[in-house]
Regions:
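C-terminal subdomain of the subtilisin-like protease fold in secreted/lumenal serine endopeptidases
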Residues: 27-28, 54-55, 69, 132-217
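Extracellular S/T/G-rich loop segment that most often corresponds to the catalytic His/Ser-adjacent loop
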Residues: 48-132, 136
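Residue-level detector of buried hydrophobic side-chain packing
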Residues: 58, 79, 117, 126, ...
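Short beta-strand-plus-loop segments that form exposed binding edges in beta-rich domains
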Residues: 294-303
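Extracellular calcium-associated, cysteine-rich motifs in secreted modular proteins
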Residues: 319-420
């Protein structure tokens, strides 16, 4: 539980590009083992591969349908699948083995495979069946189908809570045990998850010091005015702390449903330095309303910390305007019509920020539109003077003549040569 690790920016960009461009634009599918560190209080959200929204994080359950003794929880977990474990009767997973003595046994098979590394390929196999039944599904369709077809295992487990959209979801199991039959049945008639919409709020820079060893939360609220039906949420935090394992970090949605991003655990490492947490707990909830990031230092010791900055990034399907269809709603897009001009500047320049055929003129390409530029053609003469002097203010080859250089153009000068 004392390792916080994530892929670098090139790897993240490669995963994202593959999700959007693989399979001729439908996107490649990534499944990822949630992790086997439960006995060390590890959490899948401390793994930047497993909490990436383009991957499907998979936890493990035993043959009783209960959390395997090693399977890490996390707000990023989408589904769970069977693997080894169980008490009082232990049962492993049977699979092929390395031939001969180098394997788990002298034979070519083993009945003791396990871990989330066993649960994850089971999910991959079900996804293959889903894609076989409907080859036109994109990467978001696959995730949506898993959310809506998985079954609620171990129903009496207290980790199950209903989110604001009516889904039962668990930090141990995600949306439940994968169900091949239900998933394929749903996939056969699946049409579309809708056009993706993304919106960010922040970064906010509170610079707030955290009280040490208290049971009360330090809260950072933000009101979201737009309506996106959520799929995933990313939370970027920059928190200075000399023992980050002391911190509880929770995101609360307008419905009151909570994503536990980090819980107190044995990790004396420093800081969450621009760390990206991921959560799927709010799937199908609306973004509209008050969101709260809650942080507390629950250990009384000499370690202290400060919340330097944080940011919320929403992904889903928006009931919002997106004029240029770039996936970012106009509310969050500095250039709504994608014409290369900032909306605020367009308004100042008396052009339409929602029409990419309506762009500010900038004759001299100085970055100031003609509407606001005193010298449209950049010839050194103010436009109003050029108009008075019968020269063209939009042509820098047309400049007022001033033979005697007295500052009055010949057109208006009663004595052009200044000879009295």
């Amino acid at each position: 539980g004392d390792i916080l690790e994530a892929p670098g920016p090139i790897t993240i960009a490669a995963i994202e590009s593959s999700s959007y461009n693989g399979r001729s634009g439908l996107g490649n599918i990534y499944t990822w083992a949630a992790g086997n560190g439960l006995e060390f209080d590890d959490n899948s959200n401390y793994d930047g591969w497993a909490n990436n929204r383009h991957t499907i994080a998979v936890s493990a359950i035993n043959h009783y349908g209960e959390q395997s003794y090693y399977s890490e929880p996390g707000a990023n977990i989408l589904v769970t699948a069977h693997s080894n474990g169980g008490f009082p009767v232990y049962q492993g997973i049977s699979t092929t083995d390395i031939t001969g003595s180098p394997g788990y046994s002298n034979g070519d098979y083993t009945s003791n495979f396990g871990g989330t590394s066993s649960a994850t390929p089971l999910v991959s196999g079900v996804i293959a069946l889903i894609m076989e039944s409907n080859p036109n599904l994109n990467w978001r369709d696959i995730q949506n189908i898993l959310v809506h077809s998985s079954r609620r295992n171990h129903a009496n487990d207290t980790s199950w809570n209903m989110n604001g959209a009516g889904h039962y979801v668990s930090h141990k199991y995600g949306f439940g045990a994968i169900d091949a039959g239900q998933a394929v049945s749903l996939a056969e008639n699946w049409t579309s998850s809708g056009t993706e919409t993304n919106a960010s709020f922040g970064p906010f820079n509170p610079g707030t010091e955290l009280d040490n060893g208290v049971s009360t939360w330090t809260e950072f609220p933000v009101t979201v005015p737009i309506d996106i039906r959520l799929e995933s949420v990313e939370v970027m935090v920059d928190i200075s702390h000399t023992s980050r394992g002391n911190l509880d970090i929770v995101l609360e949605s307008p419905s009151g449903h909570e994503s536990w991003l980090s819980e107190e655990h044995d990790d004396s490492g420093n800081d969450y330095s621009n760390w990206m947490f991921g959560t799927v707990q709010h799937w199908d909830e609306s973004t509209t309303g008050n969101w709260i990031l809650k942080v507390r230092d629950s250990v009384s010791d000499s370690n202290s910390g400060t919340v330097n900055s944080w940011e919320l990034i929403f992904h889903g399907v928006g009931n919002v305007s997106d004029t240029d269809n770039d996936g970012w709603p106009d509310y969050n897009d500095p250039d709504d019509d994608d014409d290369g001009w900032n909306d605020t500047i367009e308004i100042s320049c008396d052009t339409d920020p929602l029409d990419n055929n309506s762009t500010p003129a900038d004759t001299d390409s100085d970055g100031v539109c003609d509407f606001l530029d005193d010298d449209d053609d950049g010839d050194g003469f103010v436009d109003s003077e050029e108009g008075s002097c019968a020269s063209d203010p939009l042509d820098n080859n047309s400049t007022p003549a001033d033979t005697d250089s007295d500052g009055v153009c010949d057109f208006l000068d009663d004595d052009d040569d200044g000879d009295g």
